[in-house]
Every structure is written in structure tokens, then in C-alpha cells.
Amino acid sequence: MKKILMTLAAVLCCWVTTTVFTACGDKDDETIEPPVQTRTLSAAEVCYLVHMPYNGRNICNYIVSYKEADGQEKSGMLADTAWVKRITVSDFPFTATINMNVQRNEAELTDSAYNFRVYYSVYSVTSIFSDGTRVETYRDATPTYIGLTCPARTAEAYIAERFPERLKAKSIELSTDGKVLYFQTR
């Protein structure tokens, strides 16, 4: 009787083991792919920047021209030492352009010397995707800089002759996927 019970226990143990381990198996040959997120570019934020920190701005009018999101050229006289303009573009390709113009105003030359410094740039581009993600795709590490310190007696000539030859337009072109295709100073 002991032999029959031992045989029955062994068969029962094998049957339970087979049933349990077969039920817990998984399929290692199938790989589960994570869902692919498709995000598309919905817009880009372009940031223009102008900085003119010195006293040359007291005797000059600084006029900035830039391209708006709708492609129209806008311009205006700057009243402060720093100017930042952000536009959101949704039509691609788009060429962002900034240009400076300096004109002598009616103010008297009261200082003994003048510092003319202007930094201007298409400073940064941030791509905005359909899922709300924002990625900075471009930052201008070297804004256009023009400047000179001159005595008051030569300030008039410098404004009339030197500024026009040094002021160049800066442009960048954004492709249909929001990438910066080229950067140009002309």
C-alpha cells in the first residue's frame, strides 16, 4: 500500500508541476513595440534682439526693421537701450530678417566723446510641436556688433559715413520642419 501511495503522490506531483509551469509561461519570441508618437511642427517662435547700451543713442535715432510672422516688413524707432520682439510663425518655410538703421537726430553734442555700440540679432528660434513640446533649435552665439568710441567733433562724420557701411541685415531661414537651413549676414 505504501508503494501505491508513493507512486500516486509522484504522479500527482508531476501533474501539478506540469500544469502550474505551463500556465505561467510567456512568449519570448514576440516583441511588443511601444507606440510611436508622431509629433509634427505646429509653429516656431522667433526672437529678435537689439541692445544699444551707450551714450551714442542720445544723439541718434536707432531704427529697427524686421519681418513679422505674416511676412510683412515692420520698422520702428527704438526708445530704450534694449528691444526684444517675439513672433510666432506657422507658415513654413519662413525667413526671419532683422536690420538696423542709424540716423542723426536734432540733439546737441554735449559730451566730449560718444560710444556707439549696437548689438542686434535674430537671437533664437524655438520649435513648437503638436504635442506642446518646445525645443530651442537655434541660438545666435555671436550677434552682429558694431561700435566705436569717438570724440564729439568726429561723431557727425562717423554717423554719416561709417554706420551705413557696417550695418548689415541678418537672416535665417526655417524649413518646413522648423530647422534652421542657413544663417546669413548681408
Residue positions per predicted region:
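Tryptophan-paired
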Residues: S65-N105
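Sec-dependent bacterial lipoprotein signal peptides
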Residues: M1-A23
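Surface-exposed flexible segments
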Residues: Y54-E73, L109-S121
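Extracytoplasmic electrostatic interaction patches
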Residues: T97-R186
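Polar/charged side chains located within well-ordered beta-strands of beta-rich proteins
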Residues: Y48, K85, S124-S127
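Short, surface-exposed binding/anchoring microloops in extracellular/periplasmic proteins
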Residues: P34-S65
